[in-house]
Amino acid sequence: MANIVFKLSDKDITTLMSRITFDTENLPQGMKARAKYQNTTVNIYQSGKVMFQGNHAEAVSKELLPQHSQLNTNKTKKKNMANSFLEQTLMYDQFNCIGSDEAGSGDYFGPLTVCAAFVTKEHVPILKTLGVDDSKKLTDTKIVELADQLVTFIPHSLLTLHNEKYNIQQAKGWTQVKMKAVLHNEAIKNVLEKIDSSQLDYIVIDQFAKREVYNHYALSDIPLPKKTKFETKGESKSLAIAVASIISRYAFVTYMDQISKNINMTIPKGAGAKVDVIAAKIIKKYGLSHLDTISKKHFKNREKAQKILKPL
């Protein structure tokens, strides 16, 4: 299935929306309009990007956007090749890769989320056009916008270890390294079940432990050990990891937003002093047991929050 993306001006978007009928209600966050035309999905995003998705994507894009052509996409690709991010990812992005990454491991509040994603050579130009990058460089709003698009065409597996289960496993002696090894391995196996593994060149894991440590903790064998690589700062070296990073971060951010709504407080990320203060407020209003259902109990923030309350 082909995917073609254009960056349009407001005027061009208005013209496009006048040519066919678009839905503008009940859309994912970041999406402005959506249409189905000649077996092709046309998505217009608030960012000004338009994605044509389907077997006839190129023909439909030429029909609806005659002033544009696939050359625009090629020019964008060539322009992007000049930037440092593409230079860093050039090796892996010449191959079909599964990348895996996690989010939430350094945050007191919220779950641990892990994603594995399969990115082919054909995906690279569209991912570059969409603006896929290391999730640590992206705002939460941009992550949500990108993830809503990525999950529609990238084969992936997203796993979430919620706080209550996380705390149970941690109490049994599971370290974060073991949790991540198990989740990464399961997510990768899930993706392998969705694709033709003969098309896979590499599995690239954002390294959080050395290979032998990962093997020890994963509970099951690495599916394709000879094709598996471990990369530090993997988001900047592999687009597959960058995609996995965005989707896992999206799941974490979405969950954090839901927690904030549920308790009517803005829950900060990380594990700093602001987190201690909010944790103390939650204990005072809802009790320590409730705090434990939305946080990682073994973090020092729990003890610090209780100390904040003692003088009160």
Swiss-Prot record:
GO terms classed as biological process: DNA replication, removal of RNA primer; mismatch repair
- GO terms for CC? cytoplasm; ribonuclease H2 complex
- One Pfam family recorded for the sequence: RNase_HII
Enzyme Commission number, as recorded: 3.1.26.4
* Keyword vocabulary terms for this entry: Cytoplasm, Endonuclease, Hydrolase, Magnesium, Metal-binding, Nuclease
Primary site of residence: cytoplasm
Q: Which InterPro entries match?
A: RNase_HII/HIII (IPR001352), RNase_HII/HIII_dom (IPR024567), RNase_HIII (IPR004641), RNase_HIII_N (IPR024568), RNaseH-like_sf (IPR012337), RNaseH_sf (IPR036397), TBP_dom_sf (IPR012295)
Q: Which GO terms describe its molecular function?
A: magnesium ion binding; RNA binding; RNA-DNA hybrid ribonuclease activity
Protein location: Cytoplasm
Q: Which cofactor does it need?
A: Mn(2+); Mg(2+)
Record's cofactor remark: Manganese or magnesium. Binds 1 divalent metal ion per monomer in the absence of substrate. May bind a second metal ion after substrate binding.
What catalytic activity does the UniProt entry give for this protein? Endonucleolytic cleavage to 5'-phosphomonoester
Similarity annotation? Belongs to the RNase HII family. RnhC subfamily.
Q: What is this protein called?
A: Ribonuclease HIII
Underlying gene: rnhC
